[in-house]
Amino acid sequence: MLERASGEIVGIEIKAAETVTGRDFAGLWHLAERVGDRFLAGFVLHLGTQSLPFGPRMRALPLSALWHARS
């Protein structure tokens, strides 16, 4: 979890798998429910290669995206 001084929150989960399912977002959905409007986004980082949306403000991202800059 990352929190700004203003109280806004981004949730991050890391999975040691190449595939992601909706169940992998359960903790992030719970966090979003608890903090309400302060929740900005949730991300599941995984070992696969695709970036996929999983609903409003939720996204699965390849872990490698952290090291690959776009030009």
Residues of each region from the PLM?
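A cross-kingdom feature that marks ATP-driven nucleic-acid transaction machinery
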Residues: 1-71
